[in-house]
Amino acid sequence: MAGLQLAPHLPVGVMFPHNKTEAHGLHSAKHDPYEQSDSPQRSSMGHLRTSFQQKLWSNTELEQEDVISTHPKRNICTKARRHSCPHSAGISQQGSGNNAQGQGKGLFYLSSPTPRYPKANDQDFIPFRKKRVGVDRAYPLKPMVHRKSHSTSETGIDGDQNGYPRLPDSSEFSDSSFGLRSWVNPSLLASPQAEKVMAQLHRTEWTQIQRLEAAGESLQKEIRRKEILLREKLKKTEEGLRRIQREKKQAIFQEDRELQRMVLPRRRVRDGDLDTTHNSCLSPELRSEVFSRNRGEDQTCEQAQENSSPLQLSDYEIQRLKRERLMVSNNKIRDRDSGPSAGTFSQPAEDLGDELQASSLSGTPGSSGSSSSTEEQELGKCSHCGRSFLSLRLQRHSTVCGKMQGSKRKVFDSSRARAKGTELEQYLNWRGPATDKAEPPPRKSTWRQKHESFIRTLRHARQVQQVIARGGNPSDLPSILPAENPDYVQCPHCSRHFAPKVAERHIPKCKTIKNRPPPPRRHDS
């Protein structure tokens, strides 16, 4: 055991190769010092070490396969490892006796001069991670970046021992330095994932935009449909309003036509007299101007009637009738101003009847004084109401007025209404109608006496207040006279005054009380 030499301590950053053959060669290269020795102990330790490393390698491979099967997203890691593992195929160890420091370190180097970081085709490399509790495999945590500050001299020393760049340590595959301290550039790793995320975002945005456009088109179609419906409704309402207006105009036109038929014969007679009086007042120049204007209006109206529709004709007829009515009303006002008898001439025959004929005979403009005198003589008074009427109307009024004055309102008898349908009704009918009670004479108004007595009481109360304020005795003042009310009745037994109805109840009671015999005296025992 004294001559036993332990194997140099392996560094933590040893990377196991992908192929088992390479691993076997590596292990054999590692354990050359033990095999060269002739002692059986060294050979047994070497075999144990190799078997242990083989078991460890198989376990790590199984774990990696499980991770890949459970998380398909990590296939990228296998790709990166396949790209990177061939570079570590030719691993050798410095076996010279002079370079003892190299054997003590036990560092492995690549057989080919590969750079420290892989090329651009290794962008998809993502290092493996061991299973941990509480870590989501689908959404791994963001790795922690711990950059080591290696000097250029150290790297040069490590790399110049064999002239080859150093392999990365196994700590670079640890969970604390996930992804960013690996052989692959992190910006190159993030680019495909970012592209996928951006493509997915663009796809979702495009679908949302398409949905919004479809919704907008559907809204526009709905708005157009509603606009069409509203326009149709407006057209229907406009047509209905126009139809109603036409019906109204036709009704007005028919009414005016009927009025024109009724008024036309009267107006012909009246217009003849009015035209003569009106033209006599006008000068010849004005008369010719008015005649030419009326003639032009008639010609234009005839042309309009020929070329226009029935509705336009009705409008023209309405305007013409209105103008004629205004002329008639002006003529009536002028006739009233000229004389009172003209008003009787313009009254309609339906209202006056025979009276209009009698008044029209005496209603000539030349006999205005005689007509007023005859009207005064014909007036007579009604015997019932005392109003004055014409002799022609007085008889009719007197008959109606006599009926109104003679008819009295039937008084409602509540006792008969209650007794109706009972045996008491026969008794009331046999008894006959109740005799009307004699109405009491009307009372005389005594408001002045009441007012004077009220003023006297107020003055007496004011005097009493003044005496009390001075500190005197109010009993020294003369007593106020009792208020004299002539309506009140004095009781003969107690000499008090009561209202008439109250006195009727009080006097018999007071009489019985006063006429009672005195109570018997009590004999004291």
From Swiss-Prot:
Cofactor(s) listed in the protein's UniProt record: Zn(2+)
Zinc finger (C2HC/C3H-type): 378-407, 487-516
GO function term, MF aspect, one: zinc ion binding
Binding site for Zn(2+) 2: C491, C494, H506, C510
Biased composition regions of type Basic and acidic residues, renumbered to the chain: 23-34
Coiled-coil zones: 207-252
Region (Disordered): 23-48, 85-107, 145-171, 292-316, 330-349, 356-379
Entries under Pfam families matching the protein: zf-C2HC_2 (PF13913)
Binding site for Zn(2+) 1: C382, C385, H397, C401
Bias (Low complexity): 90-102, 359-373
Composition skew (Polar residues), residue ranges: 36-48, 301-312
Keyword line: Coiled coil, Metal-binding, Repeat, Zinc, Zinc-finger
Top-rank taxon, per record: Eukaryota
UniProt similarity note: Belongs to the ZC2HC1 family.
Protein name per the record: Zinc finger C2HC domain-containing protein 1C
